[in-house]
Amino acid sequence: QPWLPFG
């Protein structure tokens, strides 16, 4: 997920 650092 682009808005999460692990996404």
From Swiss-Prot:
One of its GO terms (biological process) is positive regulation of smooth muscle contraction. Belongs to the frog skin active peptide (FSAP) family. Peroniin subfamily. The modification Glycine amide is found at residue 7. GO terms for cellular component: extracellular region. Induces contraction of intestinal smooth muscle in isolated guinea pig ileum. Expressed by the skin dorsal glands. Keywords: Amidation, Amphibian defense peptide, Pyrrolidone carboxylic acid, Secreted. The modification Pyrrolidone carboxylic acid is found at residue 1. It is found in: Secreted. This is Peroniin-1.1. It comes from the Eukaryota.
